[in-house]
Amino acid sequence: MTRPDADERAIQAPVLSDVLRRRVRHVVSENRRVIETVSAFKNHDLDKAGELFRASHASLRDDFEVSTSEIDKLCLLAERVQGIYGVRLTGGGFGGAVVALAEARRARAAAEELVNAYRNTTGHPGTVVVPA
């Protein structure tokens, strides 16, 4: 049995409730996304890496159910900001922080634009950390 076959069997195990099935699906698909993201970074394919970030967030939101409406709003707003390839929830879930993959030359401006859009949309302040 190959690894993908074993993963699919784990997802489809008849003993799993619907909730547990979604949790297993997230873990299996997230492991695949991590491997694909490493490959995308090695190939300097930031568009692909951004797509994988967005898919990761969708899985965290829908399958693992650890996102919040505020974080989901922030991720949606990020999709409209030029220079941001993708964004996802990070940390333990249930709010807190996102990590965004952005063009280096636009990172600070993109982060400020995102925080301003979030503040204007929700009334909540945001804090940005842009690595040097």
Predicted features along the sequence, with ranges:
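Short beta-strand->loop micro-motif that forms the acidic, two-metal-ion catalytic signature
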Residues: G95-L101
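C-terminal nucleotide
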Residues: M1-G86, L101-A132
